C-alpha cells in the first residue's frame, strides 16, 4: 500500500473495506521469458489481437485510454476498465472496474464489481511462474444484498473465469516466445494500426528481432 499513489491507495482501501470475494491462484511454469511477458503486458491492444489469433474465447477487444488504463470488451455483455496502479519488473497491481450483463455467463442478474488484482511473476528453474491474488467488491450494497442467494455461484464463476483467463495468457505468452512470427500476418490482416505498431515494436517487423 505504501508504494501506491494516494488516490490509488484510497481506491484500494475502499474495495478492501467493502470486500465480497477473495481469490488466489498459482500459474504453472511456462517456457517464456519475463521480458516477453512484460512486452505483452505493456501493450494491451497487441495482447488482445494475439489472444484473438489464438482463438481463445471470449474474443476480447481492448482500447487504450492512457499509458496506464485500457478497456476490455467482448462486445457481448462482458466489459470493464483496467487501470495499472503499480508496476515493477515481475509485479503489477491493477484496479478492474467491470460488469457482466445478465445472462452473459449464465448469471441470473447483471453484476458490476471493482477488483484489485496483484500479479507476481518470475523466472523459476522450470520456466516463468506466477501468483495471482484478487480482492473483489460488488458495486453496491443493494447488489450485494440481491446477490446473496447467488453469492457462491457468482464467486465460483468468477474464480473459474479468472483461472481460465490467466491460463490462456500463460499459453499465449509461451507461443509468442517461441513463434512470434506466426502472429505477424494475422495482425496485419485485422488491420488495427495500433496493434501492428505494437507488434513491430515488441517483436520486429516480421516477428524476428
Language-model segment annotations:
Residues 61-110:
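Glycine-rich portal/gate segments that line the openings of hydrophobic small-molecule binding cavities
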Amino acid at each position: 500500500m505504501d508504494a501506491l499513489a494516494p488516490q490509488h491507495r484510497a481506491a484500494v482501501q475502499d474495495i478492501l473495506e467493502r470486500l465480497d470475494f477473495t481469490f488466489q491462484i498459482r500459474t504453472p511454469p511456462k517456457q517464456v521469458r519475463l521480458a516477453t511477458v512484460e512486452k505483452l503486458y505493456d501493450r494491451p491492444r497487441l495482447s488482445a489481437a494475439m489472444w484473438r489469433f489464438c482463438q481463445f474465447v471470449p474474443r476480447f477487444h481492448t482500447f487504450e485510454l492512457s499509458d496506464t488504463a485500457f478497456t476490455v470488451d467482448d462486445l457481448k455483455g462482458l466489459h470493464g476498465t483496467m487501470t495499472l496502479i503499480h508496476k515493477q519488473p515481475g509485479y503489477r497491481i491493477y484496479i478492474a472496474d467491470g460488469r457482466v450483463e445478465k445472462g452473459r455467463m449464465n448469471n441470473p442478474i447483471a453484476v458490476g464489481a471493482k477488483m484489485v488484482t496483484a500479479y507476481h511473476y518470475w523466472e523459476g528453474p522450470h520456466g516463468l511462474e506466477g501468483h495471482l491474488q484478487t480482492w473483489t467488491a460488488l458495486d453496491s450494497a443493494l447488489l450485494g444484498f440481491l446477490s446473496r442467494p447467488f453469492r457462491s455461484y457468482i464467486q465460483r464463476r468468477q474464480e473459474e473465469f479468472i483461472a481460465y483467463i490467466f491460463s490462456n495468457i500463460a499459453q499465449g505468452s509461451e507461443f509468442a516466445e517461441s513463434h512470434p512470427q506466426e502472429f505477424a500476418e494475422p495482425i496485419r490482416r485485422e488491420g488495427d494500426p495500433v496493434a501492428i505498431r505494437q507488434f513491430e515494436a515488441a517483436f520486429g517487423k516480421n516477428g524476428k528481432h
